Amino acid sequence: MFLKAVVLSLALVAVTGARAEVNADQVATVMWDYFSQLGSNAKKAVEHLQKSELTQQLNTLFQDKLGEVNTYTEDLQKKLVPFATELHERLTKDSEKLKEEIRRELEELRARLLPHATEVSQKIGDNVRELQQRLGPFTGGLRTQVNTQVQQLQRQLKPYAERMESVLRQNIRNLEASVAPYADEFKAKIDQNVEELKGSLTPYAEELKAKIDQNVEELRRSLAPYAQDVQEKLNHQLEGLAFQMKKQAEELKAKISANADELRQKLVPVAENVHGHLKGNTEGLQKSLLELRSHLDQQVEEFRLKVEPYGETFNKALVQQVEDLRQKLGPLAGDVEGHLSFLEKDLRDKVNTFFSTLKEEASQGQSQALPAQEKAQAPLEG
């Protein structure tokens, strides 16, 4: 059941993306989570993927979700499952091979850096402190921005609740006609303010990626003198570090966005509940309005308490990743597994290439079809 759910969700993500813009990152995340959770059973899962029954279910899913399928999504449907099957098969085969390659790479790096172990550890420690200094303002900035946006959300929404209560107190006969516009505006304002909230908080992820690049580049320069004949191997490890750190930034962005959407989902039903009582008695409407104000304050406060600490948690995660690199390169590293981040990076690169190729082919197909269509629509000369 887990396998079927994951593969169906993979197809669904791709299909819903095809309606607007295909998000290769979403598809790659589904595939990587699938591979990670299956673990040692990945080979068996690949065999299941190839069964015709599952392919038929995917075909049914495309038909159910899309109805009339356009040329692009039909092409995607045909290519997605074989691509996923082949890629997971390669992941299974490459995992142990890559693990051994990374082990040897780290051994060579450690051997080369061993005479300078103290200096290398010091340089990485300096980099950690610089990273903490760079991220400090981000933590405070995110916390401030969350508070600002939450207060703005409450300021924008409360007046609508107050106006509806005022109309109710005035005992206006036609409550439905008087209150309904405010209830509609309240619901629209929820959508508008949640989108603004997401728009103000998610750009932090892009700023963080720039800081990550800067910090990793400084670390590379500081370690370069100690790794002159193994520079390529050091660069490879730093690429893995940057990938993992940027992944944290993307996860932060996704968590903020998901919490904002969750806030909207919790507020909208209360607004709809007011609508539902407009044709009922005054007492029911009054009760739903009281619930609306109290629910608004409660849910907004829960959102604030949940999102505020994200900056600090994110900072700690980034610092820990640099510390993990220090351990990998140190003389007492032990059996540190570092190959999975490289495997995931390779998967994401391949998924991006796959979708870029599909989009390019679709674009070329549309370009070729346009002149033929224009020719067919041209008036006949008499």
Curated annotation (Swiss-Prot):
Keywords: Chylomicron, HDL, Lipid transport, Repeat, Secreted, Signal, Transport. Its main location: secreted. One of its GO terms (cellular component) is very-low-density lipoprotein particle. Transmembrane segments: none annotated. GO terms for biological process: acylglycerol homeostasis; cholesterol efflux; cholesterol metabolic process; lipoprotein metabolic process; phospholipid efflux. It is found in: Secreted. Residues 1-20 form the signal peptide. Sequence repeats lie at residues 33-54, 60-81, 82-103, 115-136, 137-158, 159-180, 181-202, 203-224, 225-246, 247-268, 269-286, 287-308, 309-330. Residues 33-330 are annotated as: 13 X 22 AA approximate tandem repeats. The keyword Nucleotide-binding does not apply. One of its GO terms (molecular function) is phospholipid binding. Pfam families: Apolipoprotein. Residues 361-382 are annotated as: Disordered. Secreted in plasma. Homodimer. Nine of the thirteen 22-amino acid tandem repeats (each 22-mer is actually a tandem array of two, A and B, related 11-mers) occurring in this sequence are predicted to be highly alpha-helical, and many of these helices are amphipathic. They may therefore serve as lipid-binding domains with lecithin:cholesterol acyltransferase (LCAT) activating abilities. Belongs to the apolipoprotein A1/A4/E family. May have a role in chylomicrons and VLDL secretion and catabolism. Required for efficient activation of lipoprotein lipase by ApoC-II; potent activator of LCAT. Apoa-IV is a major component of HDL and chylomicrons. This is Apolipoprotein A-IV. It comes from Sus scrofa (Pig).
